[in-house]
């Protein structure tokens, strides 16, 4: 574990977006963290009861440990994060970024724990994405594309990213030969892409409020559009502002089958090191429910991804 004492996360008791407003690079978001704050605040609007099944829980893909978190060593971050997530029983994800060290360190971290995970790639030009899919295959149980990241502020002017069409994504899906996820469903354009592509997994997300997109929360978008999205995808997942059991239940009530957890896992890792993420998940669910909610595609009895 190698953590810079001057990390950028404030270690808030509850991560709600209000202590790091507008900090980007950093832990905040665009529009003075407006969508980040809304993501955290609005799941409660859709909580009705505990009678729904818990959605599965997965670590969200996160990179940029040095510039965004203040971690001392970029590569080590992925090993520490993945190991702590395995200890917590979470299904795994890794992300992509610039430089390529970010993706390839994530792949190494999965190999280190002898696990597979969801690999979420940035929307690079097609040929580069084919190469990245190939490099990820041995460690991937799911291949995904962060389609909304073409407009991400932290990579602007550093690399060429593209707004992907359904045709572009269909070529990647065919090449991957694995369950294929589209992450970043948050606009009417995104819904049309899902309708044409029919992905195995559609992930409602506004990138944690870190990209310039429509204003609003993941919860409100799911409430308005999940049923329509579900008609054209195998599963619908959610990513954004999910912090506690009631949030998970609200997501489940809307039809979400799996949720991604991001910033709170970083906070937990920084606070309690290798035990942090387990302590965090156990504190909000309890050990028995943690076992129910956590699991990876390769080890839990998930439904097969039927073609819509």
Per-range role (PLM):
Residues 1-39, 219-308:
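Alpha/beta catalytic cores of nucleotide-metabolism and tRNA/nucleoside-modifying enzymes
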Residues 1-125, 305:
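N-terminal capping/small domains of soluble enzymes
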Residues 18-58, 113-117, 126-127, 134-142, ...:
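Generic structural signal for short, solvent-exposed loop/turn connectors between secondary structure elements
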Residues 73-79, 102-108, 129-133, 165-167, ...:
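Well-ordered, non-membrane alpha-helical segments in soluble/globular domains
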Residues 83, 125-238, 245-267, 300-305:
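Alpha/beta enzyme core
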Residues 86, 174, 295:
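Short polybasic/polar patches that bind polyanions
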Residues 107-115, 159-160, 197-198, 217-220, ...:
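Short low-complexity, flexible loop/linker segments enriched in glycine and/or proline
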């Amino acid at each position: 574990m190698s953590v810079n004492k001057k990390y950028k996360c404030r270690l808030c008791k509850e991560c709600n977006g209000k202590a790091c407003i507008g900090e980007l690079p950093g832990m905040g978001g665009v529009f003075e963290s407006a969508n980040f704050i809304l993501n955290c605040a609005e799941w409660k609007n859709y909580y009705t009861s505990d009678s729904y099944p818990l959605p599965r829980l997965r670590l969200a893909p996160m990179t940029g440990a040095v510039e965004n978190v203040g971690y001392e060593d970029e590569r080590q971050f992925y090993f520490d994060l993945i190991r702590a997530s395995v200890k917590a029983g979470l299904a795994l994800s890794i992300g992509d970024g610039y430089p390529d060290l970010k993706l390839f360190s994530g792949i190494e971290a999965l190999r280190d724990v002898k696990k597979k995970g969801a690999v979420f790639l940035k929307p690079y030009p097609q040929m580069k994405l084919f190469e990245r899919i190939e490099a990820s295959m041995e460690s991937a149980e799911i291949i995904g594309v962060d389609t909304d990241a073409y407009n991400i502020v932290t990579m602007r002017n550093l690399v060429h990213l593209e707004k992907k069409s359904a045709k572009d994504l269909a070529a990647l899906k065919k090449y991957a030969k694995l369950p294929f996820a589209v992450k970043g469903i948050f606009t009417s354009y995104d819904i049309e892409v899902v309708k044409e592509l029919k992905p195995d997994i559609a992930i409602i997300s506004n990138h944690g409020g870190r990209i310039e997109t429509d204003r609003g929360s993941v919860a409100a978008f799911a409430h308005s559009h999940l049923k329509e999205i579900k008609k054209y995808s195998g599963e619908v997942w959610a990513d954004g502002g999910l912090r506690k059991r009631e949030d998970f239940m609200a997501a489940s009530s809307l039809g979400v089958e799996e949720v991604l957890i991001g910033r709170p896992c970083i906070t937990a890792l920084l606070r309690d090191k290798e035990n942090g993420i387990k302590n965090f998940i156990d504190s909000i669910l309890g050990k028995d429910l943690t076992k129910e909610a956590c699991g990876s595609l390769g080890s839990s009895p998930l439904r097969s991804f039927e073609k819509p």
